[in-house]
Amino acid sequence: MTKEQYQSWSAPFRSPRGERWLNRVNFLLTRLCYAAYPLCLLWLAATRDSRGIPALLVPAVSFLLVSVFRNLYNAKRPYELLEIQPIIHKDKKGKSFPSRHVFSVFVIAMTFLWLCPPAGAVFLVVGVLLALCRVIGGVHFPRDVIAGALAGIAAGACYWLIW
């Protein structure tokens, strides 16, 4: 992504109203997933569903692995390299690849897809929308969110491969 591409993609959101809207959508999509997942785990525990252990372990272990990789790779963010003002305000330096927000939403989506396919499909759409927000918001390059999505999908494939 070049500075010009970013400016073109983010132009429709470069107003106080557009910035508020994008930040709210980013916040709400993130919170939706981060609220739904623990509720899912509680439901699995309450019903003594044997899928609860893998539903906890797959996201937890893969989240840890992605976090370690991000720290080691330490890719810069668009606002560090392109001299842009991001719409989603962030002061963090580096640790952009892969997007952990997008990874998390996709591994959660895969968890739901394994447990309840219609809910999983909804969360996959949420993941795509969040990925778009993160790029338009200027906090990730397209490669960051694509890698995050693919890593989340790959981690979630463990449900079908192992259990």
Language-model features, listed with the residues they occupy:
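N-terminal transmembrane-helix/juxtamembrane module of multi-pass inner/ER membrane proteins
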Residues: 1-37, 50, 66-94
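Small-polar-interrupted transmembrane alpha-helices in polytopic inner-membrane proteins
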Residues: 57-70, 121-133
